[in-house]
Curated annotation (Swiss-Prot):
This is Xaa-Pro dipeptidyl-peptidase. It holds the Pfam family Peptidase_S15. It comes from Streptococcus equi subsp. zooepidemicus (strain MGCS10565). Its EC number is 3.4.14.11. Homodimer. One of its GO terms (cellular component) is cytoplasm. GO terms for molecular function: aminopeptidase activity; dipeptidyl-peptidase activity; serine-type peptidase activity. The active site is at residues 349, 469, 499. The lineage of its organism: Bacteria, Bacillati, Bacillota, Bacilli, Lactobacillales.
Amino acid sequence: MRYNQLSYIPTSLETAVAELQALGFAVQQEQAPKESFAIFLRKLFFHFQDTDYPLSHMIATKELDLLSFLASDEALTKEVFDLVALQVLGFIPAVDFTDTQDFIQKIGFPIVFDSQQLLLNLHQLLATRQKSGVTLIDSLVSQGLLPMDNCYHYFNGKALATFDTTSLIREVVYVEAPLDTDQDGQLDLIKVNIIRPKASTAIPSMMTASPYHQGINETANDKKLHRMEGELSPKAPRRITVEPTDFQPLATKPSRLPVNECQETFSHISSYTLNDYFLARGFANLYVSGVGTAGSTGFMTSGDYAQIESFKAVIDWLNGRATAYTSHKRDYQIKADWSNGLVATTGKSYLGTMSTGLATTGVDGLAVIIAEAAISSWYDYYRENGLVCSPGGYPGEDLDVLTELTYSRNLLPGDYLRHNDHYQQLLSQQSQALERQSGNYNQFWHDRNYLPQADHIKCEVVYTHGLQDWNVKPRQVYNIFNALPDGLGKHLFLHHGEHVYMHNWQSIDFREAMNALLCQKMLGQNNGFTLPTIIWQDNQKEQTWKELTAFGGHSKRQIALGEDHVLIDNHYGEEDFKRYSKDFRAFKAELFEGKANQAVIDILLEEDLPINGQACLKLKLKSSENKGILSAQLLDYGKKKRFADIPAILELDSIDNGQQFAREALKELPFKDSPYRVVTKGVLNLQHRSNLLTIEDIPNDQWMTITFHLQPTIYHMAKGDTLRVVLYTTDFEHTIRDNSNYALTLDLEQSYLLIPTDEEE
């Protein structure tokens, strides 16, 4: 374990003492340091009437157990404090470490002992994570240090788990959205599952906008998958134009219906453990699936502003601007009189995507979005540079396939009976509008691009994204983060995992940092917390995070690619083509081994290379036909320690998100030997060699110069490392599988690689 403590808020001695005393630690500024230390330690063992017993099982020095030390005349030194603090945090001498000071250095222990400031040290110790992944104070509260009295209690600017999760209110309401997406003449109703603690004051909400949450139709999804094998068709040259998105919600009016209490409850809904964490700390949890999902009405419009409006309506209801009904009969309305109107949105992938879309509406009441692996442009999810480009791991998926997956109204037989025929008509229109045959950007995709609306965002923004996420690729967060308005509170966590959550990792106190931020923004805590702009996981060191100021360096380093002409054949023999089409992982493995149709350029680095941004290939090439796909990958090549891209479980159920509530596993990305690592990649239709909106002819056997931007990343390579450039045509994971007989020729002498770096110019 290594500490990267973001969440601790430096405080005054007076505040520290007051907070310690409020928790029952009977310390005083006038006490001798050793006396305060003893009082603090004995309080940790509040389950014991005889606290001598647990103290006797700890050590203070190599010669003295802790109980004997406290009774002795020995002084409290840094060595003693550090050794005892480590044990309090769950580290075991002679098991986890032998030399205390070496271990303190190794793990980046965040507390610097000062006998004159011991109470500040003890205050920070309570706010420091244990080996198990929870802070010491959260561990104590989970054991019953404070009662579950349904009142807010804070420590170091963060809410504690004092809300009773054994007696929660679970209710369902139906919010009226200003939409009629299924064209039935009635405004769409949106089902909202609410879980909230019993509180005497108005409380904020965590909202997860999840089209998956009311069920998914995998059978319909699988039937709708598109065939990847086919021939890349040349496109007529033209300039693509689109109009600004012009979504207009329908008119609504305040309801005059009588107000009633909830008429529908539920016992269980799958939850997100970050929401559970906040539920125990006095935040309501709302799960909303939006239009076209089971329990709601409407059509699944998949990514456009109509879908986003269905989630926005819920925030409007929480603030008294929209109507909710107790049932589909629409005969009683229900008020969110428990809500303080402030909302934070959470969730990964599609869920985080809806957070971004919501933020671009500028809706009042949305205080913070915590958007993980979020899409900012749906074109860039299902297309790339004029090509159909399946998200990593899901060849054949497209937006209409996702519609089939998430249109969970068809999982209700009555809804299927009444609405499926009309749904199929709307789905057919959607399938035509996405222009799978051409791969072009068009109005359909522009209406699902949130980047042009980024200047409307006014809430605090937190993004997390994996730099090995080839499902929702890094360009999604790169573009939205760099499009955010100046002066906005914005924060980005970049890790080296794939499409994964990171709130339960050992090496970073993400959960606690979000607690401090949300208490500041949603509970009026003037805690002085400041979250860095960019927190990046250092790819060269285990469990190490660094603060950066920008995603995208201003300096460029030009790297030559060679002197030869190289030929890349597109066509494979029938056996190989079938094998690769059946299992794209076999293609990837052989590509990285140099066994596919490809050009490989190995570059031995003569100095460190700190990549930050979009690497760019400047290439001179020609195609033997009037079409062509160019795919590229950059690899950190050669055996050495690197991060795996899926977090491993370190300890099951070690994280308690409340008081014996919603336990989850502690995880971390393994750091282990590997033969190579993908640094970045990309695909390009050569007819879009100038830009996305310009389609150009490809003249047979005539040289072209292209600019090819790869996915952005932040990745540091060291002097002596090998940067491998892999160039090829068809990518069996992502692109159309075109096995036609054409080839690309590259003039490497007239080509180069341009690397953005975070070096100062």
